Amino acid sequence: MVEDILAPGLRVVFCGINPGLSSAGTGFPFAHPANRFWKVIYQAGFTDRQLKPQEAQHLLDYRCGVTKLVDRPTVQANEVSKQELHAGGRKLIEKIEDYQPQALAILGKQAYEQGFSQRGAQWGKQTLTIGSTQIWVLPNPSGLSRVSLEKLVEAYRELDQALVVRGL
């Protein structure tokens, strides 16, 4: 089981779709060697060094957290049903209301659209909020994603810079 890494007062909570088998096996988020999450958040400015999956708890030192829409691990995220994503979206809203981070970053358009019953999402900041928490949709850093490392870093950096501008 991959546990959430959450605390009150975070700058951002990154929300993956669901754990892959590598993460489920190790208990650490974004654990597959091909997953670019740790490299991306470092290069985008969220951390001052590239953390390893087993150092995930140190995200809290940077006022960052991690959660997921669906707890069930799969080989590929497309094995998760629309119903699971929708139910996960409802649970996620409750978590965000409890912890009130400044931003929630959903990692993937389809995850956001199905989890929050939205259509036509664009990358970046959304108009929908959860209380005062901004919602951002960022490309998924999975090794299966065709988005280049450069584009991932650019998208994540935009969120980091928006938080910096707000003094966070």
Curated annotation (Swiss-Prot):
Disulfide pairings: none
Signal sequence region: none
KW Cytoplasm (keyword) present: yes
Catalytic activity field: Specifically hydrolyzes mismatched double-stranded DNA and polynucleotides, releasing free uracil
Keywords from the UniProt entry: Cytoplasm, DNA damage, DNA excision, DNA repair, DNA-binding, Hydrolase
A cellular component annotation (GO) from this entry: cytoplasm
Localization per Swiss-Prot or TrEMBL: Cytoplasm
GO molecular function: DNA binding; pyrimidine-specific mismatch base pair DNA N-glycosylase activity; uracil DNA N-glycosylase activity
UniProt-listed InterPro entries: MUG/TDG (IPR015637), MUG_bact (IPR023502), Uracil-DNA_glycosylase-like (IPR005122), Uracil-DNA_glycosylase-like_sf (IPR036895)
Source species, domain of life: Bacteria
EC number(s) on file: 3.2.2.28
Keyword Manganese listed: no
Role of this protein: Excises ethenocytosine and uracil, which can arise by alkylation or deamination of cytosine, respectively, from the corresponding mispairs with guanine in ds-DNA. It is capable of hydrolyzing the carbon-nitrogen bond between the sugar-phosphate backbone of the DNA and the mispaired base. The complementary strand guanine functions in substrate recognition. Required for DNA damage lesion repair in stationary-phase cells.
Family, similarity comment: Belongs to the uracil-DNA glycosylase (UDG) superfamily. TDG/mug family.
Protein name as catalogued: G/U mismatch-specific DNA glycosylase
